[in-house]
Amino acid sequence: MEPDSGQLTVAVQRSAHAVVVRPEGELDRDGELPLREALEKAVAATPGLLVVDCAGLTFCDSAGLDLILGAREVVETAGGALVLAEPGPALSGLLEIAGAEEVLRVYGTLAEALAAGEH
């Protein structure tokens, strides 16, 4: 049986000053568990900057955005920062409609997000 092409997978990469979480596939209420688990671990381990690299997302609904916003709140309460990189069309429209760009820092590339966190 072939895996669902929209199934969400998540890669995590750590560096000295950041944790990068890269979800790939469809982020919705039914498939958010891999990202939820990765964010929970990253939030507990982040040295200050948590970057959610959204370049691999093909879809995101309000449940996915709520998950990201909840993680941002936890990270900021602990004194860190959560930023988004490369939201692309799957997430950009949702960010705009929800007004989430008012509370989330969004960068066009992963490199820009990481560089902003070094300052």
Residue ranges and their predicted role:
Residues 1-7, 115-119:
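Short, low-complexity, intrinsically disordered N-terminal peptides in bacterial proteins
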Residues 2, 11-12, 74, 96:
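Short secondary-structure boundary/capping segments
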Residues 3-37:
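STAS-typified acidic loop motif
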Residues 15-16, 55, 87, 111:
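Conserved catalytic submotifs in the C-terminal HATPase_c
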Residues 17, 100-103, 109:
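Glycine-centered tight turns that cap/initiate beta-strands
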Residues 17-18, 81-82, 86, 118:
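Long, contiguous secondary-structure blocks with strong helical propensity
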Residues 27-104:
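Amphipathic alpha-helical interaction surfaces in cytosolic regulatory modules
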Residues 105-119:
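A charged, well-structured terminal subsegment
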